[in-house]
């Protein structure tokens, strides 16, 4: 069964290099496409989903923005499993200050290059292994600042209230982007941060193996 991976906002398929699938499941990494001006997240998800073969069962795995994107795709196509990691499936699990930021349109005040710079600074201070940190910083450097700014705006304007069927939600108790206290995950990683697929991938892989066992 094909398993489609969707990365976070300033990343690509390399972010999943530590994630392993059991026999019978094939990893396919969906690359981001260029958004249209002020395109809604729901419309973008429809266009991204054109890369998915929907004539056969498939699994979706998304991290951060990728988890939100995977949620939108799952709502339309109802795959056997939707797995989001360090993400949220509905607006009610976002912190209230996201809505304040959207109402004040704070995303308009800063250029995409500033978001990109802040992402780099954050990862200089995190606990990834040196090789992982090097790859992450390279991915951030290669990301179009305009895409980062679009992604932030799209998330702040997202309003989904429906929980998809077959949702599996992995979340760390120290997630600094989507605080744990607002979420309702199916699987919790104690003291896990937002970058679980890099900092706690051993535990993520164990959880994934348990989930995939139910799909065989």
Question: For each of these PLM feature ranges, what is it?
Answer:
Residues 38-39, 192-207:
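Catalytic histidine-centered segment of alpha/beta-hydrolase-like enzymes
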Residues 18, 72-76:
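Active-site signature of alpha/beta-hydrolase-fold catalytic machinery across serine-
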Residues 1-56, 104-112, 193:
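Active-site catalytic motif of lipid deacylating hydrolases and related acyltransferases
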Residues 169-171, 175:
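Short beta-strand/loop motif that positions the catalytic acidic residue
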């Amino acid at each position: 069964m094909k398993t489609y991976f969707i990365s976070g906002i300033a990343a690509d398929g390399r972010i999943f290099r530590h994630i392993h699938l059991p026999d019978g499941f094939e990893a396919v990494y969906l690359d981001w496409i260029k958004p249209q001006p002020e395109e809604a997240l729901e419309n973008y998800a429809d266009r991204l989903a054109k890369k998915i073969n929907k004539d056969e069962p498939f699994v979706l795995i998304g991290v951060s923005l990728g988890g939100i994107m995977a949620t939108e795709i799952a709502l339309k196509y109802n795959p056997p499993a939707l797995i989001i990691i360090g993400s949220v499936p509905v607006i009610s699990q976002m912190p209230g200050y996201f809505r304040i930021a959207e109402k004040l349109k704070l995303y308009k005040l800063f250029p995409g290059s500033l978001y990109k710079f802040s992402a780099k600074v954050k990862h200089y201070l995190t606990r990834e292994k040196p090789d992982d940190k090097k790859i992450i910083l390279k991915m951030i450097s290669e990301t179009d600042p305009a895409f980062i700014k679009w992604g932030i705006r799209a998330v702040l304007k997202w309003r989904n209230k429906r929980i998809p069927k077959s949702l599996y939600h992995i979340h760390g108790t120290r997630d600094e982007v989507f605080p744990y206290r607002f979420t309702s995950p199916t699987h919790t990683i104690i003291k896990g941060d937002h970058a679980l697929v890099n900092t706690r991938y051993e535990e993520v892989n164990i959880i994934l193996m348990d989930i995939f066992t139910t799909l065989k």
